[in-house]
Amino acid sequence: EGDFTPRL
């Protein structure tokens, strides 16, 4: 929550 890191 907070930063959005697009990880599969």
UniProtKB/Swiss-Prot annotation:
Mediates visceral muscle contractile activity (myotropic activity). GO terms for cellular component: extracellular region. It comes from the Eukaryota. It is found in: Secreted. Belongs to the pyrokinin family. Keywords: Amidation, Neuropeptide, Secreted. The modification Leucine amide is found at L8. It comes from Locusta migratoria (Migratory locust). One of its GO terms (biological process) is neuropeptide signaling pathway. This is Locustamyotropin-2.
